[in-house]
C-alpha cells in the first residue's frame, strides 16, 4: 500500500480523498491555488503546496507544477479526482514515467475510451448498442450533411474529445448543421485543444443512465449497478439517483453487462463510468466512458456499501478486487443533489462571495459532502459546486421525503444557491413519478 498520496484537485473531492486516505493510514499532500490559501480542508492534509495563481491553466492544469509538488512531497501516487487532469492520458503517462502511480486507468486505456469516436467503434465491435451516426470523424460540412441525410434530422454534433456538454450542438436542419459544426469545432478546440467532430442521431426526450464499473490488474471487472442522471440542465447534472426508477430489470441488467463488456475490451482498470441514453421504448445506446471518479459516486456508495475512493486506491496499489459480481448487491434508494453557488432565477448566474453561515442537515441516512464552512469564500475561478447532499433510505419515496426535508434544513447564507430549485424539482409530480427526460428542467424552468 502507498505511504503518501498527492491529490491533484481541490474542494469537496480533495477533502473526500483526504478522508479516505486517513482511514487507510495513508499520508496526503494537497496542492492549492493562491486564492484557496487558508482553506480549512487543506489543514487536514499532511502537507500542502501552492502551485500557482487562480487560473487553472497556470496551476491545476500545469503538469510540471503538479509533478514538482509530488516529487517535493515524496509521494508514491497521485489521485486526480475529477476534472482538471483526471482524464488527461498524457498526465497519466508522465506520472508513471516518473515512477509515480496514477490512481486511474492506464494512459493507453484512457486514450482509447477518451476518444469518443474510437470508443463508439469499440462498443460496436463488442456488441454494445450505439446511436446511429457517422462511421468516424466528419471531415467537413459536406460530409456531415450527407450523414445527416442518411440518418435523418435532428442530429447531434459532438466533439471527439469533448465532455461536460462542451463541443455539442443539436441541429434540426442542414443550415443549422453547418452553423453547429463551426460552433462545436471552435468550442472543442478552445476547451480541449482538439476540434475533431462526429455526428449522432439526436435521440429526443431520452433518459440518462450510467453504470459504475471497477476493474483490477488481475483481469477482474465488475459493475456496481446504475445511476439515473436524467435531471440535468444543458448537459450539466443536477440530481442523480440509484437505482434508476422505472427501468425494466431486463434493461438494467443488459446495460450493466454491456458496460462491463466494453471496459474489458478496452483493457480498462480502476473506477470508471459508462454512460448510456435510454429512449422511450426502452432501447439503450452507449454515449461515452468517463475515465475517472464521478461527482455523483456517493449514490452508488450508499446503495452498495462500497467505498469507491478506497477501492480506487487499493486497485492502483495492485490489490485484487475483494468482491465478485455476485457479491455486489444494492439496498434501498439514494438521491444526490448538487448544491451550486448559482442563481437559478437569473440563468444560473454564478454567485461567488463569502459564506456568512452554513448549517448542514443531519438525520438518519443523510450525508453532506462539502469543503465549505462559515467564512469560506466561493471564488469565481472554478465551477460553482459547494456541496453534495446525499440521502439513503429503504425506498425511493422515503428518499424523496428525506432529501426534501434535508434541503429545507440546509442553511447557506452569503451566496445564492440552487437549493430552492432542488426543492421545486423534488416537489414536482413528474419527478416523483419518474416521468422525466433530459430536457425536463429546461422545459419546466426556462431561463
Question: What do these predicted ranges mean?
Answer:
Residues 147-156:
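Acidic/histidine-enriched active-site and ligand-binding environments that engage anionic O-linkages
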Residues 133-134:
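Conserved beta3 strand of the protein kinase N-lobe
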Amino acid at each position: 500500500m502507498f505511504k503518501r498520496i498527492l491529490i491533484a484537485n481541490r474542494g469537496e473531492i480533495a477533502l473526500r480523498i483526504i478522508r479516505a486516505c486517513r482511514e487507510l493510514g495513508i499520508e496526503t499532500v494537497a496542492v492549492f491555488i493562491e486564492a484557496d490559501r487558508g482553506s480549512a480542508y487543506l489543514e487536514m492534509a499532511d502537507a500542502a503546496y501552492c502551485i500557482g495563481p487562480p487560473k487553472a491553466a497556470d496551476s491545476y492544469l500545469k503538469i510540471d507544477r503538479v509533478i514538482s509538488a509530488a516529487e517535493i512531497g515524496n509521494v508514491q501516487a497521485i489521485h486526480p479526482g475529477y476534472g482538471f487532469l483526471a482524464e488527461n492520458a498524457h498526465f497519466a503517462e508522465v506520472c508513471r514515467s516518473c515512477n509515480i502511480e496514477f490512481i486511474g486507468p492506464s494512459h493507453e486505456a484512457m486514450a482509447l475510451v477518451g476518444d469518443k469516436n474510437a470508443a463508439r467503434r469499440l462498443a460496436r465491435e463488442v456488441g454494445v448498442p450505439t446511436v446511429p451516426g457517422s462511421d468516424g470523424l466528419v471531415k467537413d460540412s459536406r460530409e456531415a450533411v450527407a450523414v445527416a441525410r442518411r440518418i435523418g434530422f435532428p442530429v447531434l454534433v459532438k466533439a471527439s474529445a469533448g465532455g461536460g456538454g462542451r463541443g455539442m450542438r443539436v441541429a434540426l436542419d442542414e443550415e443549422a448543421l453547418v452553423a453547429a459544426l463551426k460552433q462545436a469545432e471552435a468550442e472543442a478546440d478552445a476547451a480541449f485543444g482538439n476540434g475533431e467532430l462526429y455526428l449522432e442521431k439526436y435521440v429526443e426526450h431520452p433518459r440518462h443512465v450510467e453504470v459504475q464499473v471497477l476493474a483490477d490488474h488481475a483481469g477482474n471487472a465488475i459493475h456496481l449497478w446504475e445511476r439515473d442522471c436524467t435531471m440535468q440542465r444543458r448537459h450539466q447534472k443536477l440530481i442523480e439517483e440509484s437505482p434508476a426508477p422505472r427501468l425494466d430489470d431486463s434493461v438494467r441488467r443488459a446495460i450493466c453487462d454491456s458496460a462491463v463488456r466494453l471496459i474489458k475490451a478496452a483493457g480498462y482498470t480502476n473506477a470508471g463510468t459508462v454512460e448510456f441514453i435510454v429512449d422511450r421504448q426502452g432501447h439503450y445506446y452507449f454515449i461515452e466512458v468517463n475515465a475517472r471518479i464521478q461527482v455523483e459516486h456517493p449514490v452508488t456508495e450508499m446503495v452498495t456499501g462500497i467505498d469507491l475512493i478506497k477501492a480506487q486506491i487499493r486497485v492502483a496499489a495492485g490489490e485484487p478486487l475483494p468482491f465478485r459480481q455476485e457479491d455486489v448487491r444494492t439496498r434501498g434508494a439514494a438521491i444526490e443533489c448538487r448544491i451550486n453557488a448559482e442563481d437559478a432565477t437569473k440563468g444560473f448566474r454564478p454567485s461567488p462571495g463569502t459564506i456568512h453561515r452554513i448549517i448542514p442537515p443531519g438525520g438518519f441516512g443523510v450525508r453532506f459532502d462539502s469543503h465549505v464552512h462559515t467564512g469560506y469564500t466561493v471564488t469565481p475561478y472554478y465551477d460553482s459546486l459547494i456541496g453534495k447532499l446525499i440521502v439513503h433510505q429503504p425506498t425511493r419515496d422515503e428518499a424523496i421525503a428525506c432529501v426534501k426535508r434535508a434541503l429545507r434544513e440546509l442553511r447557506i447564507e452569503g451566496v445564492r444557491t440552487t437549493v430552492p430549485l432542488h426543492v421545486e424539482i423534488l416537489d414536482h409530480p413528474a419527478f416523483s413519478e419518474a416521468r422525466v427526460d433530459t430536457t425536463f428542467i429546461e422545459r419546466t424552468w426556462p431561463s
